A protein has these predicted regions:
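Catalytic-core signal marking the mid-to-C-terminal active-site face
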Residues: 3-7, 12-15, 22, 250, ...
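Active-site cofactor/substrate anionic-group-binding motifs, chiefly glycine-
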Residues: 48-102
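Phosphate/diphosphate-binding glycine-rich loops and adjacent basic-rich segments that engage nucleotide
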Residues: 148-220
Length: 361
């Protein structure tokens, strides 16, 4: 496959679903995982898209990822619930967690959902969008257990994960306002994408094993490993620390320290604490009008007419629209790794080649 090739999203979805069916996932599980990964690529976040498949296959083969498992209720009290993800596909248990939280928010006006011990839950904005589609605000604090990748402010090595923070606000007859980012300067997956492409990352994102700043993504992919830096120095570090506590400790899960370190970088375990709010719970009849007035006010001051001001989440909306028409781009290195993973789990070569022909057409 040539670099820069674009794949039809629907055909690619069928292939990804077939990969997980080959791995042993039941039909609904394979669909939910494929839905999520393709949606991440369509939204422009390739770091959380189908490029994760080789890591998932390795995690499963090492006994970390548990297929065909579901979230288990640990404690439930009114509007609050704590769930054990049972090391299942995060794309499954997070979907179940958000569905339960939405149900509680309909009933109580507000819900708090704590999920721990889940395998990688992917792009957090996807779960916020699930809440927004139901008309709800949601706030998400996420931690990554036992795989330190990010150095604290003034730190010399990695001490915690990329710990995403996410907020969504639904809008009437318009796309939701969505804030979703890792508290590291860039997501770990973006170093993987850059490494496969053979390109540097922006300055201010990485340090090498000696703590020296670098733009070489190999320091996050090849030993000896360096570390990501937090965004905005002490501000990103402080938010990352709160995500570690609210996402990890408060959810009933673990925080990252000497006793919780994982032996495999593919054993990605997430914890997430989510607050889901029905905006009608508040006495704010003018809320939508005020939101739109602010949006119009902000967008009306571009410095350059060729670079319009985007609202939070608008970049994803635009990228999704473009990729649905033009296809999902994938570099040759990532595609080769996905095909190798498919072979590793026993997908027949003729089946793989048949999909390749469909995708190339």
């Amino acid at each position: 496959m040539e670099s820069g090739h674009r794949f039809d999203a629907q055909t690619l979805h069928s292939f990804i679903q077939a990969v997980f069916r080959q791995m042993g996932s039941e039909e609904q599980e394979a669909k939910l995982v494929a839905d999520h990964l393709i949606a991440a690529n369509l939204a422009g976040h390739d770091s959380h898209g189908i490029g994760m498949i080789p890591s998932y296959v390795r995690s499963w083969s090492q006994g970390h990822l548990q297929i065909n498992h579901h979230a288990k209720t640990v404690k439930e009290s009114g509007a609050a619930v704590t769930l054990d993800g049972d090391r299942a596909f995060g794309q499954v248990v997070a979907h179940e967690a958000m569905a339960l939280g939405i149900e509680k928010a309909h009933k109580h006006g507000i819900a708090a959902v704590a999920l721990h011990n889940s395998h990688h839950i992917g792009r957090i904005g996807y779960w916020a969008e699930q809440c927004a589609a139901a008309g709800f605000v949601s706030i998400h604090f996420v931690s990554v257990v036992g795989i330190p990748m990010v150095a604290p402010f003034h730190g010399r090595d990695s001490r915690f994960g990329t710990n995403p923070f996410c907020v969504v606000f639904p809008r009437k007859d318009n796309f939701p306002l969505l804030l979703d980012y890792a508290t590291s300067a860039i997501a770990f997956g973006k170093t993987r994408v850059a490494w496969h492409k053979g390109v540097p990352v922006p300055p201010g994102c990485l340090i090498d094993v000696n703590g020296v700043p670098t733009t070489n993504p190999a320091v996050m992919q090849e030993s000896p490993l360096g570390a990501l830096l937090t965004f905005a120095e002490h501000k990103g570090y402080a938010l990352a620390a709160m995500c570690e506590i609210l996402g990890g400790a408060l959810s009933g899960g673990k925080t990252t320290h000497q006793e919780t370190l994982q032996t495999s970088p593919d054993a990605i375990l997430n914890c997430m604490t989510t607050i889901i709010i029905n905006p009608e719970l508040f006495g704010a009849p003018d809320c939508n009008a005020q939101t739109e007035a602010f949006a119009e006010w902000v967008k009306a001051s571009p410095h350059d007419d060729d670079k319009p001001i985007l609202l939070p989440g608008e970049w994803e909306v635009n990228t999704r629209r473009e990729r649905q028409k033009q296809g999902i781009p994938l570099d040759a290195g990532s595609w080769q790794a996905i095909c190798d993973a498919a072979r590793q789990i026993g997908m027949p070569e003729e089946t793989l080649q048949a999909f390749c022909q469909q995708l190339a057409s």
